[in-house]
């Protein structure tokens, strides 16, 4: 349970937010008066709603503060001298102090957890839209993903585009694409589309469209993705024809040579996955094809690597049971961890990049993908790393340290200027 000081601090913080929110309302009102269209009207309404919600939160906190003051006056004689709260089953006070009361009313334990997204419902919803709005939303959630999430955290947002509309009784109305932007406390429904689920689904549905427009997430562009993707067809064919050290050297049915190659191992993996594919995933693949999507059927597809251009946080469900695809995504997630480790070891890494060393893209990808129903084959990831790991690392975007002579010249100028305007010691560049 929060103390009175904590409640007072929270009230002060919200009052500061309220001042900003009211100023934004005034700005929106001026904009609406200047140009009274639907967009400005909606912006004004949204900002008024934000200001009203902050005001209601302040009112609620003030009620809590008043209740706490009243309790303090009346409960002195009722308080147990041992310090144990009424209702606590302990006979003696715990060494721990009493903390917050967690409200569970908003939780629904019958709802599935985030690991069990209803991919069929999500894909049916997404394929009901035209491709332009889907790809523009993907751009907003990848290239501009951080800013979009920051601006809309804790809200359910709508994407609109002139290409997306529906006819209602002969009237053309905009058809909005809804995406939820959760915060840490949000509980998502199985069919609710989050940025992670959106990227995962769309990357699996439209890899050829993403390739044609060269839409690569910044997260992927810095780990050598384009270097591996530019000659993908010849690269994957060469890899499939390379000797496979994980299979015994014996004649393989269908192999061009007497010795096993990676193609034989992938074919064997495909056979194992085919027997594991549940009906739900078969249904969503069939629906996607019926909707006109060109899906990846095998890893040597020209656009197979582009499934991961948008940095999905797990293997897309439309290619989960295609041999080698889930492992290809895991390979890229390891590259992200490798780059973060390198950046954390350099002086030029930003504070955010140094912090990211503590996270693990690979472990997250592994957990999310396996929760969808398959175990990754680590040997395929090893094969990818042996074949392409060094080339990918050589193409990492790591930033550069400043040239020592340039740094020295800049520091001299800083020192001179600081001495002119201050008696403080100059800071180091």
Curated annotation (Swiss-Prot):
Region annotation Disordered: where it falls in the sequence: 27-47, 68-91
Protein's name in the database: Nucleoprotein
Oligomeric and partner information: Homotrimer. Homomultimer. Homomultimerizes and binds to viral genomic RNA to form the nucleocapsid. Interacts with host MAP1LC3B; this interaction participates to the protection of Gn from virus-triggered autophagy. Interacts with host SNAP29; this interaction participates to the protection of glycoprotein N from virus-triggered autophagy. Interacts (via N-terminus) with host RPS19; this interaction probably mediates the loading of the 40S ribosomal subunit on viral capped mRNA during N-mediated translation initiation. Interacts with the viral RdRp. Interacts with host SUMO1 (via N-terminus).
Domain of life of the source: Viruses
Main location: virion
Region (Chaperone activity): 1-100
The EC number(s) this enzyme carries: 3.1.-.-
Region (Interaction with host UBE2I/UBC9): 188-191
UniProt comment concerning the protein's domains: The N-terminus is required for chaperone activity and, in trimeric form, this region likely serves in high affinity vRNA panhandle recognition. The N-terminus also contains a coiled coil region, which probably participates in but is insufficient to initiate N trimerization. The YxxL motif is indispensable for the interaction with host MAP1LC3B. The central region is involved in specific RNA-binding. Has distinct cap- and RNA-binding sites so it can bind simultaneously both the vRNA and mRNA cap.
InterPro entries xref list: Hanta_nucleocap
Region (Viral panhandle binding): 1-175
Residue stretches in coiled coil: 4-71
Viral RNA-binding: annotated span: 175-217
Region annotation (RdRP binding) ranges: 1-50
Pfam families: Hanta_nucleocap
Function: Encapsidates the genome protecting it from nucleases. The encapsidated genomic RNA is termed the nucleocapsid (NC) and serves as template for transcription and replication. The nucleocapsid has a left-handed helical structure. As a trimer, specifically binds and acts as a chaperone to unwind the panhandle structure formed by the viral RNA (vRNA) termini. Involved in the transcription and replication initiation of vRNA by mediating primer annealing. Plays a role in cap snatching by sequestering capped RNAs in P bodies for use by the viral RdRp during transcription initiation.
Entry similarity comment: Belongs to the hantavirus nucleocapsid protein family.
Gene from which this protein is expressed: N
GO molecular function: endonuclease activity; RNA binding
GO terms for cellular component: helical viral capsid; host cell Golgi apparatus; host cell perinuclear region of cytoplasm; ribonucleoprotein complex; viral nucleocapsid
